[in-house]
């Protein structure tokens, strides 16, 4: 009986260690349709960027005058960014960073002075 038990145990261990755990994982993809928006009118407006991805993504933004319609998503999507009017007497610029599992894309936005 002990031999049968050991044989079964050995067979199970052999099968468990012989499994192929090297399943192919798709490469993470993150692309944007446009990454630079220069000299946006001082009255503000809206810009759109197409995001192409096969993963979840997030957006980091530190400018209160540049407002994305979403800060996270998954897969392909259209991002609309509202640019508020610039009433200051200086041009301004900011970067929005879109990240997906360690891959980053930067959207550079500059706006004319008021």
What are these regions (language model features)?
Residues 109-113:
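Interdomain boundary/hinge segments at the C-termini of tandem beta-sandwich modules
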Residues 13-37, 114:
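Bacterial Sec-dependent N-terminal signal peptides
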Residues 84-90:
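Short, surface-exposed loop/turn segments at beta-strand-coil junctions that are enriched for proline
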Residues 102-108:
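Extracellular and select intracellular beta-sandwich modules with Ser/Thr-enriched
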Residues 46, 50-80:
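Surface-exposed binding patches on compact interaction domains or structured appendages
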């Amino acid at each position: 009986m002990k031999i049968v038990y050991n044989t079964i145990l050995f067979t199970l261990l052999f099968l468990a260690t012989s499994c192929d755990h090297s399943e192919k994982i798709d490469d993470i993809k993150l692309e944007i349709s446009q990454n630079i928006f220069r000299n946006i009118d001082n009255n503000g407006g809206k810009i759109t960027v197409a995001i192409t991805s096969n993963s979840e993504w997030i957006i980091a933004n530190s400018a209160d005058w540049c407002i994305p319609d979403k800060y996270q998503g998954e897969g392909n999507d259209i991002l609309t960014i509202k640019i508020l009017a610039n009433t200051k007497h200086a041009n301004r610029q900011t970067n929005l960073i879109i990240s997906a599992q360690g891959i980053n894309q930067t959207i550079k936005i500059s706006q004319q002075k008021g």
